[in-house]
Amino acid sequence: MFGISSKDTQLLENIINEIFDITTGKRNLFRYSKSEFSTNSLKKIKQIIDTRIQDSIKQNQTDMYAVAESQRIILRVKNGWYSELIEPIPASAELNSFKITLNDMIKVNQSRFDDMATLLETYAKNDYTSCIELHQTDEAGGILERLIKGMHAMQNTINTMLCNSLQNGIELQNDAGNLKQAVEALSTASNQQAASLEETAGAMEEMTSNVQQNAQKANDMASMAAQTDASAKEGAQLAQRTATAMTEIQVATDSINNAVAIIENIAFQTNILSLNAAVEAATAGDAGKGFAVVAQEVRNLANRSADAAKEIKAMAAQAAAKSNEGMNIATELTRGFEVIAGKIEQTTMLVQDVSNASREQMQGIGQINTAVTQLDQMTQENAKIAAEADTIANATIEKATAMVEDAASKNFIGKEQIKGKLQHICNTNV
Amino acid sequence: MSIYTSNGNERVLSQESFLVSETDEKGIIIFANDDFCQAAGYSVDELIGKSHNIVRHPDMPKAAFKDLWETIKRGETWNGFVKNAVKNSSEYYWVYATVFPVLRNGKRSYISCRKKPVADEIASSIDLYKTLV
Ligand SMILES: Cc1cc2nc3c(=O)[nH]c(=O)nc-3n(C[C@H](O)[C@H](O)[C@H](O)COP(=O)(O)O)c2cc1C
């Protein structure tokens, strides 16, 4: 071939294959640096080949290094570090263009992430008034679009939340203030109630002792009535016995009258006998003189007997009259005692009524006392609850104030309107 | 997809494999790519912070690494064929390594890029390394 030896042809063939293997990355080392062509014209070509193959290997190395560095940098990108770019310049134009594109992507993404980070830092400083916006070139449905839309949704949510929080806080502050007032009113009412209950308890004590005294007096009256009843009964008995005695006196008087009548009769006959004796004596003369004196004496005695009998009769009549009178009095007494007994019975019944009424009163008082005690406990409970409610109201006010202060310390869309609106209504200092 | 096929104890790298690692000034690994991890049988966490001799194979002569270090310390690029050991096994793989000295923000480091060597390249390396200590 062109006057080239077959050995040189073989070497040339090997060298051509080797060149392509190396440049396409199938081999690493050029094995024919030291081989020589015997044909003179080929010796010069060999020099060119040697130089160019070394250049080619160098270019390969440059590209390799650039790719290795790219891998290192991309790993850092993968790990979230966007601040290092690919520095080495590859020999291959395509690789270089690729590297520039990669670097551009890293820079753009870094700037987009930086925007987001800055925004989130602003949010972290409690300023929710701004957001990041889509770029014109952002592809619909892409991750960035989702991210930015998500940020907007989050911003809206936070703003709404803060608006609600501020509004609720102000309203809560107001409500808690009202609650506190109501609780204070309740507390005052409870204290007043406690005072009146104390008075009531005092009055009840007084009433209790009154009723107890009443009951005692009724008891006294009952025993007095019983004593009186006994006395009246005794009186009635005595009156009865008096009446019996009077009757006996009358019977005795009648017996006396009968005896007197006998005596009068005897006196009369004695008088007649003495008269007869005097007449006989006179007849007898002096002999009868002494006898006449005796007869006269007998006559005198008979007359005196008759007189005495008259006196006794009169006295008996008087006694009869007195006993009659006594009878009447005894009868009246008996009637009087009966009236008294009736009255005592009525009194006893009245006293019983009073006693019953006192017992019922005592029961009523007992119930009232229980009720008052319960009311007192309830009032104390109320006062305690009022105190607790006051603590809660205070805590609520504190929390509401903290809530309002917290919300008001943040910057968000709609804050000024709420502040203005509510300040106007509630006159709250936000 | 695996970057090698096994042939006995040898892991034969695929044509597309590209193993990269980086060490600091003292040869402590500070970066390794997926191909490197796969071939050597380590996870990246196991490699970072370790000396690069973690993959050293006993068949490799000291002289090779002496040359490597002398070259890169001079600020020159080193290349050569290296037999490496796989983690916890008698498996190994051959690479053609190119080691670059790097100066980044005043800090020295070294990046090694590895490609698959062809059979005759490995064979002549075996012969060469037999003559070295
Ligand atoms: C960037 C870089 C990559 C390295 N890659 C390897 C490697 O793949 N395999 C290896 O055995 N040594 C590699 N070394 C060399 C090791 O640092 C070490 O010198 C070698 O494993 C010998 O270990 P020794 O120094 O503990 O004897 C690399 C060194 C550098 C700087």
Protein language model features and the residues they cover:
Chain B
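Sensory/regulatory domains in signal-transduction proteins
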Residues: 9-131
